Each structure stands twice: as structure tokens, then as C-alpha cells.
């Protein structure tokens, strides 16, 4: 595992007394430990090669806060709310199932690597990342063909475009990718806007799933009002915690897929809690992404076995593993500052919602 230069003097422990003294909101008052982690990825993903975040410890155990660095304060504040929900203790939720079907995530890798990933996972559903770039379309199609071959005819293939296509490109690409995949279960966020998703959904036979149009939108219900999606992708952290995600699922009224955001096992457990608590779950969930991290913070790591995550999965944080992934002083200082900014943004958001 490559070690960043920052790890040579790794500390990772945020000074709690200093954090409390600077937190004018009181949101972090019951947090008794905050540890910044920094982990390499096994393969580049979304243009990054490392993932970092902070684990918060409180009366309820560990919670994770890990918004990507290109997210602004408003988009990142719900991630703190989610981490605090975990660390301060969730109220008990119903459990409707003992296992969760989980997809294997296939990054933008070559066809052979894609095939190997699918076969090794044992999953019956594959989520394949595709590029927004026209010069990479042939590689996308080859990857999809390889995934279908590895899954066999009975498996399900879905693609994730992260809103990279305009409407015309989506109309052109989706039929090609549907054919290469031997039939797509759905296309996740092929276009960025709800208007384009709605137009595309009327123009093609491939079901449409909404991700960014839910978690980054000021009005997520617009996808329902405009009939822009067949499936809702729910990510706990960007929605502000399990309870808010459950509420969103109910308000949307669409079949839901619970997904993660390159989380450690601590973050995955928040997603698993949501998936176990949804009254209906008809699609495989995207909760197998710890495989994309070169290391983890829990032992055992929360990973699906043959495409299934069990109810008894847990995320016991290992001090030994935590010591191996603690961030260096530079990143630790940045996360302490960011936590305080997030607390301010979350406090302001809650004040607005209370009016």
C-alpha cells in the first residue's frame, strides 16, 4: 500500500478540547474523540486516488463524516448531521429483512479487469461506471460487454453516468450501452438536470434512476412531479442521516436503491441500517464499496459475501487499523477547521428549517 508523505508523522487525532472551545454551535459538545483517516483507493475513482474523512465518537459509538473536498458547505452539512446521528445514537428502527442484496461496483477499468471484479465478487448485479467522454465510448461498451459475459444472462447490469451527458448525447449513447450490456436494469443520473431526465425517460426504453437530482437538489420531489425517474438512489450521508433518508424514501414513493459514497465500514453501516429499515427493497444496493479502499477502519470489514450483506454485519472499529490510516498533521488540521465550518452550516440550516 503506498503511503503518503503526510503519514510519516501521522497523528490524525483532533484536539477535542480545542474543537469544543471553538464550536459555538454546541453540535459537537457530546463528541469525545475525532480521528481523521486517509486511505488510498485500489483503483482511481471519480478522478481521485485517495479518500479521507473523520470518525466522530460519542455515546452511540462511531460516526463517519466524509464529504468530498469539492463539495461546498451547504452540500456537505448533511454529512455532519449523518455522522452525528451515528455517534450520538440512532433510535431503534424496524428491521424488515435479514440480508441485503448488494451490487459490485465496476470503475472505469479495462474489460478484463471489469470481468475479474465481477467474477470475484459473486454478485448478481453490477454497477458500471461509464465516462462522459465520447472518445472513451468504445472502452465503455467493451467494459459493459465484459461485465455481461461475466454475469451471465440472469445477472443485472446498471450504469452510472454521474450526470455527464447532455440530452442529445444520452439519447445517442443509452441504446448503444443497453445493447452492449445485453439489457440495462437502469441508467443512473445520465443527465444533470431534472428536465433532461424527464425528456430522456420519455425518449428511451431504459429505466432512469436519480441520484444527484435527489441528494444535491433543493427540491428533490421535482423528479416525481416531472416523472423524471423510475428509481431513487438514496445515500444516507448526503441526505442527513438514516431518519431523513427514510423520510425522503417515503415522500418520493419510488423503488429505492441504497448506495454509499466510498465510505469506510462505519459509513457503510449507516447505509445498511437504512436498507434493513426500508419496507420495500426490490433492487440490489450499492453497499459493497469498501473493496475500493486499500484499507479500512473496522475488523472485520463490512463487506458482502457473494453479493449479500447480512443483518449481523457490524463495524467494530479497530484501534490497530485506525492507527495505520490516521492522517498526518496537515490534513488533520484541515479537517478540524472543516468540521467547525460544517457545524456552523448545519446549525444555520436547522435554524432555517425550524422557522
Task: Label every PLM stretch briefly.
Residues 40-42, 108, 214, 262, ...:
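Short, solvent-exposed coil/turn elements at secondary-structure transition points
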Residues 2-180, 298-355:
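N-terminal capping/lid subdomain adjacent to the active-site entrance of alpha/beta enzymes
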Residues 37-39, 105, 211, 259, ...:
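Conserved beta-strand termini and adjacent loop/short-helix elements that scaffold enzyme active sites
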Residues 133-147, 165-169, 190-201, 217-219, ...:
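Active-site-adjacent beta->alpha loops and helix N-cap segments on the catalytic face
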Amino acid at each position: 500500500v503506498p503511503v503518503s508523505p503526510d503519514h510519516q508523522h501521522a497523528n490524525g487525532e483532533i484536539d477535542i478540547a480545542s474543537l469544543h472551545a471553538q464550536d459555538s454551535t454546541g453540535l459537537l459538545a457530546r463528541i469525545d474523540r475525532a480521528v481523521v483517516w486517509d486511505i488510498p483507493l485500489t483503483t482511481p475513482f471519480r478522478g481521485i486516488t485517495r479518500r479521507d474523512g473523520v470518525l466522530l465518537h460519542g455515546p452511540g459509538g462511531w460516526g463517519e463524516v466524509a464529504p468530498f473536498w469539492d463539495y461546498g458547505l451547504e452540500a456537505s452539512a448533511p454529512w455532519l448531521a449523518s455522522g452525528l446521528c451515528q455517534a450520538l445514537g440512532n433510535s431503534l428502527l424496524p428491521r424488515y429483512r435479514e440480508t441485503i442484496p448488494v451490487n459490485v461496483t465496476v470503475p472505469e477499468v479495462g474489460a478484463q479487469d471489469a470481468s475479474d471484479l465481477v467474477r470475484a465478487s459473486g454478485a448478481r448485479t453490477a454497477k458500471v461506471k461509464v465516462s462522459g467522454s465520447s472518445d472513451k465510448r468504445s472502452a465503455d461498451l467493451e467494459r459493459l460487454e465484459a461485465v455481461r459475459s461475466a454475469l451471465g444472462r440472469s445477472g443485472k447490469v446498471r450504469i452510472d453516468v454521474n450526470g455527464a451527458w447532455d440530452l442529445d448525447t444520452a439519447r445517442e449513447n443509452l441504446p448503444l450501452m443497453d445493447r452492449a450490456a445485453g439489457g440495462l436494469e437502469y441508467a443512473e443520473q445520465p443527465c444533470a438536470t431534472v428536465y433532461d431526465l424527464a425528456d430522456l425517460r420519455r425518449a428511451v426504453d431504459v429505466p432512469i434512476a436519480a441520484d444527484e437530482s435527489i441528494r444535491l437538489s433543493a427540491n428533490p420531489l421535482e423528479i416525481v412531479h416531472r416523472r423524471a425517474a423510475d428509481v431513487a438512489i438514496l445515500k444516507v450521508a448526503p441526505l442527513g442521516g438514516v431518519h431523513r433518508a427514510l423520510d425522503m424514501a417515503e415522500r418520493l414513493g419510488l423503488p429505492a436503491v441504497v448506495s454509499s459514497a466510498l465510505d469506510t465500514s462505519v459509513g457503510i453501516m449507516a447505509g445498511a441500517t437504512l436498507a434493513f429499515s426500508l419496507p420495500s427493497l426490490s433492487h440490489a444496493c450499492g453497499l459493497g464499496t469498501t473493496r475500493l479502499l486499500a484499507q479500512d477502519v473496522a475488523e472485520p470489514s463490512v463487506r458482502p459475501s457473494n453479493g449479500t450483506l447480512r443483518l449481523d454485519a457490524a463495524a467494530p472499529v479497530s484501534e490497530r487499523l485506525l492507527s495505520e490510516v490516521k492522517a498526518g498533521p496537515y490534513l488533520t488540521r484541515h479537517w478540524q477547521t472543516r468540521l467547525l465550518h460544517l457545524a456552523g452550516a448545519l446549525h444555520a440550516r436547522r435554524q432555517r428549517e425550524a422557522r
